[in-house]
Amino acid sequence: MAHSPHDALTLRRNARDALHQHRFDDVDRLLDEVEQQWLDGSTTRFGYGWLLATLLDPAQDLPTRLEQARQWCTQQPHSPHPWAVLGALWDRVCGRIRSSETIETIRQVQWDAAGLARDHALAAWLHTIARHPRPAFVLGRMLRMSCYLGEPRWLQQLQRGGRADLYTAQQHQDPDGFVAAVALLAPYGRPLEALPALPPLLAGRSEEAFEYAADYWLQQALAIRANDTDALETYLYYLYPRWGGSHALMQHFIDGADAARLMLPQRNRLRVLKERDWLGFQPDADNADDVAQYDQAYAALLDLHLDASTRALVLCWWAMLDYHLGRDEPQENQVHWDPVRMAHAHDCLAKAFALDPACVIEEGLTVLEACALFAHVDGADTLFSQVLASVEDWTDSAHALAWLAAARQSGLFGFSVDAALATRHLRGALAMAPEEDVDLSTVAANLFCAVSAPAGLQMLLDLGAAGDPRSMATLVDLYRGRVGGQDFPAFIDPAQESAWTERAIAAGDLVVIYNRAWQLGQAFEQNPEPGLQQQSRALYRRCVDEAAPHDRVWRPAHKNLAVLLYQGEDDADKQEAVFDLLGPLWWRGDSATQAWAAGFLADVFHFGNGVPANAFLAKVWLERAAEAEPDNDDVLRMRPLIDGQGKLFGASRATRQQARDRDKVDLRSWQLTFGQHAVPDRHDIQPV
C-alpha cells in the first residue's frame, strides 16, 4: 500500500512507464492492487482515486489527456480502468465549462455544455461498471454527477427499459442553445454519439428510486463498499442548504444508518464538513461576537477525535480565517497585518504541515505566503521552504510548482539552482493553472515585490514568453512603473510597455484590452476621429463577448459600450445597447450597477430614443433605480418627468398613460424588464 506520497509516486511512475510502453496488463495489475486496497477499506490520500486522477500527467492539457484516455480504451477495451479514467477526465471538463462562478451567474449555455460533458462521463462509467465486479468507485462518482448536474434523460430511459434518445428533443426545443453548447464543448470533443448498453447491475430501478436519485446512487455504492466515506461525504455536501437541504437533514444523515458503519474519526469528519457550510462564510472583522463564535467553533472541532488529514484540514481553515481577519486594507494598496492573528495562522499551518503536507499546499499555501512574505511572522519563511521542499517530488499543484520554479531558477528559499528542474516546474504550472484557476502572474508579482525583483521579473518574462496573458498584462504595468500597488519608477520603459500591450491584446487579456479601449475613447474626445471610436467600440465589444460576469472588466465594458452605442445615430446600435448591454447589467450587476442601468432604461423608455416610448416601462425602471439607490441622479432627474410632477393633473395623466402603455409593450421589451421567460398576461403581444 502507498502509505506515503513518495511510495505513491513510485507506484505512479511504474504505472505511467507501463502505459507509455503499452504494457497494458501491467497497468491493470498495478491499478487492480491499489483499487483492491481501497475496496478493503483503505482511506489513504494517495490511493486509487489519486492514482486515476494523476496517471495521465496533469502537466498536459485536458484535450491531450482525453485523447490519450480514448486511445487507452481502444487498446485495452475489456479493462475497467481506462474507462474510469476517461470518465474522470470528462468530469473535469464539466468543471472547466461550468467554471468557478457562483451558481447564480452561470449562463444557461454553460449548464447545457456541462451536461454534454456529463453524458460522456456517465457513458464511460457505464463501460467501467459493465467490466468490473465491484465498481464502487465509479458508482460514487455517478452519485456526485447526478447531484451536481442531474441525471440525463437517456440514462433514465435505459433504466426504464425503453429506447433512449440522446439529443433529438433538446435540438428541437432549443436549436440555437444546443449549437452554442456544442461550440463550448468543442475544445474537448463532440457530443456523445452512441450509448453503451446498460450494465445488469443498474437494471430494474424502481420508480421511487427515480424520484430520489441521490439515495439510489448512494445505496448502489454502499452495497459494494459499506464504509465508502467519499460517497457519504458527497451525499452530505448536497444536503447543504445551498443545494436545497438543511443543517437538520445533514445531522439526521450523520446520525443515521448509512453513517453508522463508520469509525468515530470518519463520522467526525462528516461533522466537520457539516460545520464547514457556515464556517466557509467569513465573519465581519468588526463583529467581535461573530469572530468569537468562529474561533470557538474551530477549537471545538479540533477537540473531536479526528484523523490526521481531517485535523490538518480544520487547521488550514482556521488559518484562512486568521488571514481574513488579520489583513486590513483601509485604503487601496495600504495593507496592515494583525501580528496576533497572523502568528496564530502560522501556528495552525505548522501543525497542519506536521500532519499532512499536501493539505497545506491545497488549503493553506496562500495564507503561508502572506505569513512569510508580507506579514513577516517569525519562522514562517522557514516553514514556507519546508512545505515546498516536502512536496517537490510529487506535487501537482500549479501554485506550488510556480514557487518551486522560482526557487530552482534563482536559488531562493534554501534550494540549489537547477535550471532544467525550474523549467520543468514552470511548464507544469502553466499547464495546470487554467484547470486549477490559479493566476501565475500573482505568484510572479509577489515574488517581484516581496522576495527578489530580478527573480520576479525573470518569471514574468518566462510566463509572458510562454503565452500567459495575465503575466503579459503585469509586464505592461511594470513597464509603466507600478506593480502590486507599489511604485517601481526604475522600470518605466514606454517601448516595452507598448510591445507587451500589443502582445497582451493579441493573447486576449481582457484588462489590457479594456484599458486600450478606454484610452482610445479618451483620445477620441480630444480628436474626434471616427476611426478611434470604432476601434474603441471593437475592443469594448471583445470584452463584452469574452468576459464572464465575475471578471473585473465585465461591468465597465458593458457600461462604456452601451454609452458609445447609444450616443450614435443608428437605431440598431441603440437597441443593442438597451437589450444586449443594459439588460445584463440590471440582471447581473450589484446594486450600484443596477441603479445606473435602471436609470438609463427609465430615460430610454421615457423619451423613446431608439425604442418606442413607453410610460409603463419608464415607470417600472424608475422605481427599480430608486429601490437600488434612492439618491441616484437619474432618479432625481427623471421622477418629475415620469410622474408628471409640476403639471396640472400631471400625476393622474401620467398614471393613465402608464396603464394604457402597459398593453403596448412588445415581447422583447417585456422580457428585458421581467425576465427572458416572462410572458405578459394578454393576447396582443407585439412581435419583436
Please tell me what each predicted stretch does.
Residues 6, 25-75, 86-134, 138-224, ...:
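Short coil/linker segments at helix-helix boundaries
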Residues 69, 125, 218, 254, ...:
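Hydrophobic/aromatic packing residues within the alpha-helices of TPR/SEL1-like helical repeat arrays
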Residues 78-80, 131-134, 227, 306-310, ...:
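Short helix-capping/linker turns of helical repeat alpha-solenoids
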Residues 89-90, 236-239, 321-322, 367-372, ...:
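Hydrophobic face of amphipathic alpha-helices that form TPR/SEL1-like repeat modules
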Residues 151-153, 242-247, 277-285, 327, ...:
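Alpha-helical linker/edge segments of TPR/alpha-solenoid repeat scaffolds
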Residues 208, 240-245, 327-340, 354, ...:
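Short coil/turn and helix-start
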Residues 253-262, 353, 427-431, 616-630, ...:
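TPR/TPR-like (Sel1-like) alpha-helical repeat modules
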Residues 633-688:
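Terminal, low-structured helical/coil segments at or just beyond the last alpha-helical repeat
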